[in-house]
Structures are given as structure tokens and as C-alpha cells.
């Protein structure tokens, strides 16, 4: 079969056989071509024309292609969709080739190995992960080619592996073919990553991995390193020593809780805006932005480490002018980590090195500024900063101030840096000066005032004369070179001679400049470890000034840490406060301690229960990353873990219902929480029948109270459960206040002691714009239930009885005894508000967005 194809197609098929899982971009002249199934699939994914060509067989071969100069955009599209792309280049000059031009794959681009382009967000890492399965757990290794960072951790539970991979947003996971298929499928679906198989012989342990403890982490990282070697086919010298960490060194937040709390992205839109990261991000560098995300993902649990950050933040708050100067300096610092990575990979251009030079210019001032702060640790930080002055001198001496993007156009190297280059430039300049004089000489010689001397890349130098003046030219002196519509272009023997000298000089200039730049690039490589250390120092300073800036601008307070007490006075949800006018936000207290470990929260839907619960979790996270918190006063314990059961959504991927997801998340907290954990349970049990739900809710409350003792906020609509306050000494009731005003429920968003005594379900249904006749029917049914107490006269409906105590059914503000309800008179202002309500599609909004809209409309009624 192979023999029936042309030699070039045979070459293609041979290379493609080695890269079956990737699109093969096969270089043909100025295009990357794809053939056969690759072409069919690429034409669909990239929306490009599918054609065909003769390949030597009876049938024509499907083909499509993209121009090499714009290939990056097409490659990016494929990578975003989870595909891999193998770049196959011509490795010999076609003019010198005997037979088919030699080609080979020079790089395999995968979702986890993208080095540049729009596929890389400047404030996010691009980690690739490797997971290995062992008898007692899993090895996890992470590497970011763009920054050189490497991490490794041994984890007992696969759920924690998924949480770590989710935290770092790894786009690709490398496993062996023996890895459990079901587990691999879970990793792919829950983490949204591409799974890649690596079964190659693992190379000998390299220098950056020699310190790894145990065979588990060594095997896991070396599998990842082997995969990177195979795909990148170039030096990986910029990779830093593997940093080994343990989950217990930081606050543990499982995958679901990270999503529920919207730490780095929102649940609905998956965007940064609206998340805690969005709120806090006052960083000025890409490096600082990445470090901030890492800090949010892994809050500290050692008081000494937290307090060290707090002290630096407080110092920067107290030095306003120095902080503002620091922010301005950091703004001029480019991404040192990724610049170092580009240097190591050999794809750095002159403009990148100019960015490096401009960044290094800022470092001495930053070092001096930090050293001037009145704080011992700040002075120690300043003392450790290496400005890399020798590298700055080298770049200042060698690089042209405004080089082109291309490395083949010249103008890269400064005058005076290299003697031979200066000689070539003098030759080129002298020749061009001669040509500039030639135009005046020829005009004088011929008497043609419109005569021009010009140049283009196709025809070189020429003398242009309009056709009306051709009769003035001397016969035999001018050789025709090009005919235009209204003019002729000529060359003379003297011009031809100078052209050869100039073009030779310019060609020599470009070649020599490229050689000098390559040498310069190799010299810069020697500075990579120092640049990486400097990048780490700059990113830490940036993250700390970010905390100081947000804390001062938003009037946050420094939290104090306690053994067991929670005392938040006038606390605010940081993100909600930002999206609302700060004067409108209703702050709330949270008091918990030795005799108050659990809060049972009751109140209407959309009154702010979930916001209040998230608020406490976010304040705790902010405190443990070293930031100040939105409160008048904050005393907090150091939590080892945070668990949340908030929201309701079916897990369609794994075929789990809302209630099953709810129970699994509850189990995760119950099994893994300690007395030092924080648990948020929102509406546990609502996904099943009333009796089942109430029974489960009560049992969970009792279990957490009696067996775990963790700080727990438990919101519920089962008002019957509020009697547990009398039976469980650590449980206290609180509720969200709501009042009726002119037939309208006003949510006050205030947390008060005690249990709520009313529900507003029908009111919320009205806000959701359910049909009027449905609302009326609900009110009729509710009236009947109120009249019959706990024995509703409804056929085929189980008799409802409290799991804890018997109480009458919930009352409605909208029912008035047995009197027939009448529609109240509505004012013009109320009509306007009602119309505004009708235009809002609450079902497409998050609870937070809906609450904000309701609050705005409520203000109009006041």
C-alpha cells in the first residue's frame, strides 16, 4: 500500500505513524499541510477549505493547509480544544536536497506544553501534571514549562489529587498505560484535562530531582520529565529543582468547596470576575498575579508564617508613599519567569531581551525602596535581592534600543559592540550615501527634474523616468529593468556595482547580527537561576503590596488569631461589598467559641444566608493568606480545612443526582473534618422528601456536634430543627431578619439571635414570575394547611409531622385568617418597580445577583 504513494506522501505517513494522537503540521514551502484523516478533521475544527491532491494512488488524497506565518493562531485553536499538534519542519535546504527534502518533528505542542501565544494567560500558570498510582496512594508531579516551576506531592485519596489538579488548572495529565482507566476518566472529566500516555523508559534521575524522597515521587516526576523531553526536543535546563510539599502544610479546601466559594472563578461563567481572586488582585506584575492565585489556593496554617506576611502588609500600609512608588516600579517589571523560560527554550527575540533589560533597570530602586522601610524583615528582604547588574550591563552594551521582532532583519546589535559589524555598516552607509547623491547627479546630467532613484526587494535599485521624458536619456547609458504604466526603470553600470556592494554588506550585517544575537542569548542563559530567584522576590513583593493596597482602600482590619474563638464584628462579604455600594452593604457579626460551635441559620430564601456563610469562609481564607479582612474586628482560629455543601446541581458527567452530590459532599466533610475545621452546610436534605430531608439534617447536625466539634454553620428551611438548641449545648440559633411592608417582604440581611418564625416561599415564587393563577392556587392551599394544622386534608399526601416537635404549618404574611385576600392598591412607584421586576429573569441569575437586583428595587420603594 505504502509503495503506491509518492515519496513525499510516504515520508508523511512514516512520520505520522509516530504521532498518531496529534495533528501533523507537515511543512511544504510556505505552508503547513495536513493529509488524510488529519485534513478532514482539521478542516472541520478550523473551518478551512478541504481540498485534495494526487499522492500517487488511484484516489486523490484529502488535504488542507495553513500559511506558516499565521500557523500559531490555528495551532492555538486546536490546543484549546484539547488536541495535540506535531510541528514537522524541513531540516535541509530544498535547493541542496537530493530527492525528497528531509523533514522531522521538531516540537510536539500539547495543552500542557504551550509556551506562548494567546493560549497562555499572563497571570496564570500553565501546569502539566503527572499522576502515578501506588498501593497506599498517588504520586502527583506538576511542571510549568513557561516558568520552570516543578512541584511534587504524595496524596492518599484520589479526591485530593483531583482537588490539587483543579487548583492549578492543569490542562494535561500524563499517566502510564497501566493507570486505572476509570480513575483516568474521572481526572479527565472533573479536571477538564487532556490525558496523555507515557510508557517510555524513564531516564536516569536528573539533578533537579535527586533530592526527591522515595521511589513514588521520583517515578512520577521522571515520567513527566521524560514526556517533556519527547515533546519539546530541546533543552529543559531552566526547570527548577522539584519542590516537595505536603497537603497538611496548608489549609485543605476540596474541589467542590473551591468551586462553591468561587475562590478563583465564578460557578456560572467560569470567569475570574466575581471571584475572590478578582477582588484581591491589585498586583502589578504577571508573576505577582500567579503567586496570588497560588496563595489563595493554599492558605497557610502556621501562625508564624501568616504573621510574617501580616507584618509586611502592615508595614506597607503605614508607608503610603513608598508603597505607591513600589507599585509604579513593579509596573515596569515584565514577566521575568517566562522571559527566563523563553531564553532557555531558545525562542527569545531581541524585544524580549529589551523587556528583560527594562525590568532589571527597576530592581536597584526597588531594592533601595524596600530597604528603606522601617521593618526588620523588609530590610532582610532587600538584602537578599540580587539586581543582576552584570546582566544589565551586558544587555545595555549589546542590544539596539528598538530592535525588530524578526531576528533576520538586522538592527539588533548596537554600534560599537563588534568591530566587523561596524565595518559592514560603514560600507552599507557609504553606499547609500553615494546613491542619495546619485539622484541629484542624474537629474543634473539629464535635465529631468522628476527623475527618481529608488529600491524594492524584487528589482533592487533603479532609476525611474516618466515616459514623457524618455527622449532626454542618453542612448546606451541606461539599461531597462522594469516597465510601468507611466514610467520606465533603468540601471547603470555604476549603480549596478554599488548595488552589489550594498546588498552584500547588508546581507553580511544581517548574518553577523544573528550570530552575535545567538551568542548573546547563550550568555544570558547563564543567568537563568539568578533571574528565577529575582522573579520570586519580585512576585512576593507584588503580592504583599497587593494585600496592603486592597486592605487600605477597602478599610480592612488586621485579624487576630485565637485557639478556638470566632469573633467577627461587622463583617462583610468581600466580593458582594465590592459589587454593591459600600454604604449599602449590611455588615453582620459572627460569634462562635467553646460553648457555641454550631450556628443553625434560618430565614427566607434569598435573604442572605448563603452569603453570610460564604462570608465567614472567605474571611478565614483571607486571614490565612496574610491579607487583612473586611470587618470592624476579627478574631479567628486557624482552620486546617474548609468544607462546604452549598448549591444544588446534578453531576451529569458521573450520572449523580443533586441529592447524591449533596450526600457525597456531606460525607466528605463528616469523614475528613476535625475539630479545627470549618464546615458550611446549606440546606442539607432539601433534595429528598420532607421527612427524609429533615431526618438526615438532624442526624448530620447531631453527628457533627457530638463526634467532630468543628465550627459549623448550618442553614435550613426545616424550622422544626430550631428546637435542637435546647438539646445540643454547642448549637445556637440565628436568623436573617425580614419584615413585611405594604404587602411586600423586605429582606434586611441582618443576622440576629434566635430562630426565624416565618417563611416566604410564595413571595419568592412571585419574584421568580411564576404564573399568577399558580401563585393564587398556592395561597389557597396554604390557607387550607393553616386551617387543618398538621393534618392537611389532601388525598394521597402523607401526613406531615415534625421530626423534632409538632408545630402548626408555616404561616404566610399574605394570608389574613379566613378573610378573602384582596389585591392591595398599587401606587405609580410600585407599578414601576413591578415592571422592573418583570423585566428581570431571575432564573438566569445567581442568588447573589438576584439579591443585589432586589436590593436596588427595594431602595426605590423607600
Curated annotation (Swiss-Prot):
SMART domains: MUTSac, MUTSd. Gene3D superfamilies: 1.10.1420.10, DNA repair protein MutS, domain I, MutS, connector domain, P-loop containing nucleotide triphosphate hydrolases. GO terms for cellular component: cytosol. ATP binds at residues 603-610. Signal peptide: none annotated. Disulfide bonds: none annotated. GO terms for molecular function: ATP binding; ATP-dependent DNA damage sensor activity; damaged DNA binding; mismatched DNA binding. Keywords: ATP-binding, DNA damage, DNA repair, DNA-binding, Nucleotide-binding. GO terms for biological process: mismatch repair. It holds the Pfam family MutS_IV. SUPFAM superfamilies: DNA repair protein MutS, domain I (SSF55271), DNA repair protein MutS, domain II (SSF53150), DNA repair protein MutS, domain III (SSF48334), P-loop containing nucleoside triphosphate hydrolases (SSF52540). InterPro entries: DNA_mismatch_repair_MutS, DNA_mismatch_repair_MutS-lik_N, DNA_mismatch_repair_MutS/MSH, DNA_mismatch_repair_MutS_C, DNA_mismatch_repair_MutS_clamp, DNA_mismatch_repair_MutS_core, DNA_mismatch_repair_MutS_N, DNA_mismatch_repair_MutS_sf. This protein is involved in the repair of mismatches in DNA. It is possible that it carries out the mismatch recognition step. This protein has a weak ATPase activity. Belongs to the DNA mismatch repair MutS family. This is DNA mismatch repair protein MutS. It comes from Bacillus velezensis (strain DSM 23117 / BGSC 10A6 / LMG 26770 / FZB42) (Bacillus amyloliquefaciens subsp. plantarum). The gene is mutS.
